[in-house]
Amino acid sequence: DSHPAALPNWGVGSADLIYEMPIQADGSTRELALFMGDYPDGAGPVRSARVPMCSLREMWGGVFAFYGYQGGRDKNNMKSWVEANSSVKKLKYPYLNGISKHADWFPRTSDGGHVGPHNVRLDLSAVYADYSETPKPHPFTFTETGLERGEDVNGVVINYKTTADAYMTAYEYNPATGLFERYRNGYAYTDGNTGETCAYANVIVLRTDISWASGNPSRPVIRLNGQGVAEIFQNGKYIRGSWARDCSETKNLNNRMVFFDENGEELPMKVGKTFIQIVDNEQPVVVVADEAVSGSIEPQKQRSTVGTGKKKK
């Protein structure tokens, strides 16, 4: 749940990879977090899932936990999508709906001042203890060093909701740690369990086509197959590369997504945590040099990137 009232999120500091994507045509977003080894007792707040998240679940495997899901009477609803395209074929475990027999794992809490509907907390340690399968991993390739070339930058700003700063995400590079510290709406993005600021070795802006099913502004259609532009940030460096996933919208969905550098070679992720910001091809993204991202940014120190140009391997 990335609504401003859902902050601070619980357990996000334990996630190995997080995606943020638009779920409303007005720019409201939601996040999908992947936990691959550290399973906190409390994670969330948990909200309803959207169809594009199912495609990512098929790519990674494992349990997909949510609290309600995208409905509708046509094929662009989550139940129909899972029955037609998922390896599971039914919207049941490991699709884990908190409005179900597993509701005990999704208690509501007022921790951190959260109120409904932004107060559903998931016990990930209980889910992990119950899950007996070992999903086939689809990892990135990794390097200890990360990028040593590219444009020197201090950070990046993505404002999904242009009418307000309620969904503004920013990253500021910390040379002492070699990580990009995350901010939401001008404040440090912290883990509600620990109070620590979340920081990432890899920040990727994934550009793709985004539309709305049957013109409904609450039902996103996000292309996560084929290829597109990727703006990649590591070690205080920025390059414009690409992404590719060899699958159709309904077939071979377990194929992994690969990121390439500006020369079309697969780009290893730097060892550490990764955040992927999914944006529309025409979404402006501000790349910042020299000035502090969390403070005022002089116009001459920033520039906006945009565009749909695609790179091929």
What is each stretch, according to the model?
Residues 1-19, 24-312:
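A surface/extracellular/periplasmic glyco- and lipid-processing/surface-interacting theme
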